[in-house]
């Protein structure tokens, strides 16, 4: 029931206006379609709640008695943007008994800094190169036909590296931030392709 409610709410927020405007268009119903504001991170929060419910239902984790601790799991801000995806059963004990030593904090800062450097220096440079090679001046994509095959391949490879390094960097930053507050995430970005 909880998972159904979560998915219905996600559907309403993500697709409610779209569905209502299509119904209005096809039926000619003269009602005004409300603009539904999409809460930031609704998909992330929904899937966090679903993993919690599934882990508790399967008996992989016991139900959380502290609303504050459950809220912490659902809203782990540092992994909200790009992961890593973490199951409740994998970190429930750490949520209740978090301890961050000076070594953990230093290691977390180091990992976060490496991720930030990967993003700011390598991924952003690859993005600029990909844009130069693949996005024509003025946005007229018919001009791509005039580019050499080599420049297009360089653009495609730069774009591929940008995406790979972006996600790797975001994972590094999230793992580092988790370490700083006493949460050890599993490595999940060894071989994404």
Which residue stretches match the model-derived regions?
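Membrane-embedded transmembrane alpha-helical bundles that form the catalytic cores
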Residues: 1-193
């Amino acid at each position: 029931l909880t998972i159904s409610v979560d998915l219905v709410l996600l559907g309403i927020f993500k697709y409610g206006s779209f569905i209502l405007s299509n119904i209005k268009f096809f039926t000619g119903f003269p009602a005004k379609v409300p603009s539904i504001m999409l809460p930031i991170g609704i998909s992330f929060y929904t899937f966090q709640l679903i993993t919690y419910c599934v882990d508790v239902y399967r008996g992989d984790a016991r139900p959380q008695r502290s609303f504050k601790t459950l809220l912490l799991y659902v809203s782990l801000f540092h992994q909200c943007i790009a992961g890593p995806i973490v199951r409740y059963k994998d970190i429930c004990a750490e949520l209740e008994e978090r301890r961050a030593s000076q070594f953990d904090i230093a290691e977390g800062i180091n990992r976060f800094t490496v991720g930030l450097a990967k993003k700011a220096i390598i991924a952003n440079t690859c993005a600029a190169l990909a844009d130069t090679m693949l996005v024509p001046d003025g946005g007229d994509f018919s001009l791509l036909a005039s580019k050499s095959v080599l420049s297009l391949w360089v653009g495609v490879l730069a774009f591929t590296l940008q995406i790979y390094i972006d996600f790797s960097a975001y994972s590094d930053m999230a793992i580092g931030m988790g370490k700083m507050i006493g949460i050890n995430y599993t490595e999940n970005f060894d071989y994404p392709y």
